[in-house]
């Protein structure tokens, strides 16, 4: 048993057989029937309008930030979040986006008061806050799930302040199972979600990004720009 990470999970024999026999096509031309079915199913499961397959969770998160933010904008993130700690500074290096780290509590949450205090006032001297990012489950804090009630509260805060909410849901199915809720309920307050296929779901590679049709159309263009 390898307990380093769930990233070392491997496809089952049944999964390998399904891959070998899968219908294939060109995803860039959007005529790969298997990828299309995967994207349709992902959007349906998360009750969002559209979905996009990406090579990695890191790319999925970066695409979300690039769609939600313009260069020079600011995003509120947890100081122990994967986006802030473990994604090679992509938001800044490739997007010109400034992170505003907020302390993660032991239960993985960001205090609502801390989020509110981090939202920049309208002022020519300040960056413009565009986005709040949550991570569910929160990996560094022990894999704890963020509750539906908490996620709804953050979503309400985002809407009241004209911000978007992105969820790094690399392990969102773990959270849904632990909380005994559906993933679509758990992500309902969000504008976009990334979830991984290559962790507990045991696929060899890949992640999904879900959101509105307009969001995914822009993300598809940016995926090509990033080489995906």
Describe the role of every protein-language-model region:
Residues 2-228:
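Conserved PLP-enzyme active-site core in the AAT-like
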């Amino acid at each position: 048993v390898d307990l380093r990470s769930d990233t070392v999970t491997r496809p089952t024999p049944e999964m390998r057989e399904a891959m070998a026999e899968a219908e294939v096509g060109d995803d860039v031309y959007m005529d790969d029937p298997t990828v299309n079915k995967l994207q349709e199913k992902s959007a349906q499961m998360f009750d969002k309008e559209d979905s996009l397959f990406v090579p990695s969770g890191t790319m999925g998160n970066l695409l979300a930030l690039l769609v939600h933010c313009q260069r020079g904008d600011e995003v509120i993130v947890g100081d122990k979040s994967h986006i802030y700690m473990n994604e090679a500074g992509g938001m800044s290096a490739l997007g010109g986006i400034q992170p505003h780290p907020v302390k993660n509590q032991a239960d993985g949450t960001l205090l609502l008061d801390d989020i509110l205090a981090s939202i920049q006032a309208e002022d020519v001297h300040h960056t413009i806050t565009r986005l709040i990012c949550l991570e569910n489950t929160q990996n560094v804090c022990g894999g704890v799930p963020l509750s539906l009630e908490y996620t709804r509260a953050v979503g309400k805060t985002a809407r009241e302040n004209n911000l978007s909410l992105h969820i790094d849901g690399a392990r969102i199915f773990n959270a849904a199972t632990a909380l005994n809720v559906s993933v679509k309920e758990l992500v309902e307050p969000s504008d976009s979600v990334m979830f991984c296929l290559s962790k507990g779901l045991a696929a060899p590679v890949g992640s999904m990004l879900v959101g509105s049709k307009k969001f995914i159309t822009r993300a598809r263009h940016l995926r090509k720009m990033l080489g995906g």
